């Protein structure tokens, strides 16, 4: 989104949704409080800071950082990131019995229960690699993040089943001038987003994220015109949402 950082959302003090370059804004003391990292998919803009995060805080924590993702995404992280060639395998450092990181597979539709009565549920998404969105259930409402996706009816079916949806964060990577590229790369553009929103049977606050650098104004003008009924707003760096 605006601010030229890649995707990462801090939830309370202890949960991270994706680990893009936005993580680098947090001081070490706050990084050390992150217990849970939920990854939508394995593309670099969503995992760039994960290796550095675990390396930085591993010996500052009494327990490992738990990384949640689908089996397919965890397999990519094992094979291509934490493989000793690109980065050490922190699921085995300093030992397999007392590692700095552990992997936990997630399944679409199955909630992960967290302390404090919170839960996070993977949602179906459709991208060039296996991907999910996430539904975050809080005490006063819910938030949904689409992750990277293109048109995908199962995502909207899942969203429509959430009774207390407060915030909906959806990617819109390209302007309509690049609709062919949006389709090929399995992202959304404003006209595709408008078609998808027609499937939505509720009116949460709509936030737009994952915009192509240099095209924020163009994309938001198009989104504002094509999806005006949803009062879309640009999600900006450092913004705080309550639910």
Per-segment meaning from a language model:
Residues 17-20, 35-45, 68-70, 144-149, ...:
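Active-site neighborhood of phospho(di)ester-bond hydrolases with catalytic His/Asp-centered motifs
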Residues 31, 114-115, 138-140, 161-163, ...:
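Glycine-rich phosphate-binding loop signature in dinucleotide/nucleotide-binding domains
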Residues 52-55, 79, 195:
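Short, well-ordered alpha-helices that flank and scaffold nucleotide-derived cofactor binding pockets
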Residues 54-55, 60-71, 104:
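Glycine/small-residue-rich loop that forms an oxyanion/phosphate-binding "nest" at active or ligand-binding sites
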Residues 72-131, 139, 229-242:
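Metallo-beta-lactamase
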Residues 152-242:
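Cap/insert and terminal regions of metallo-dependent hydrolase folds
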């Amino acid at each position: 989104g605006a601010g030229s950082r890649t995707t990462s959302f801090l939830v309370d003090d202890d949960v991270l949704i994706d680990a893009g370059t936005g993580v680098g804004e947090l001081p070490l003391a706050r990084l050390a409080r992150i217990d849970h990292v939920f990854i939508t998919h394995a593309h670099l803009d969503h995992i760039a800071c994960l290796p550095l995060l675990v390396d930085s805080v591993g010996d500052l924590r009494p327990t490992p950082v738990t990384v949640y993702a689908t089996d397919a995404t965890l397999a990519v992280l094992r094979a291509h990131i934490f493989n000793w060639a690109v980065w050490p395998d922190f699921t085995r450092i300093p030992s397999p019995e007392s590692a700095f990181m552990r992997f936990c597979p997630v399944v679409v539709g199955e909630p992960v229960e967290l302390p404090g009565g919170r839960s996070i549920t993977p949602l179906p998404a459709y991208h060039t690699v296996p991907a999910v969105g996430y539904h975050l259930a809080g005490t006063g409402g819910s938030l949904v993040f689409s992750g990277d996706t293109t048109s995908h009816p199962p995502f909207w079916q899942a969203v429509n089943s959430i009774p207390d949806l407060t915030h909906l964060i959806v990617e819109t990577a390209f302007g309509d001038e690049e609709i062919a590229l949006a389709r090929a790369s399995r992202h959304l553009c404003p006209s595709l987003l408008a078609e998808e929103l027609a499937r939505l049977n509720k009116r949460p606050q709509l936030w737009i994220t994952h915009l192509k650098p240099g095209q924020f104004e163009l994309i938001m003008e198009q989104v504002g015109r094509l999806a005006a009924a949803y009062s879309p707003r640009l999600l900006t760096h450092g913004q705080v949402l309550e639910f």
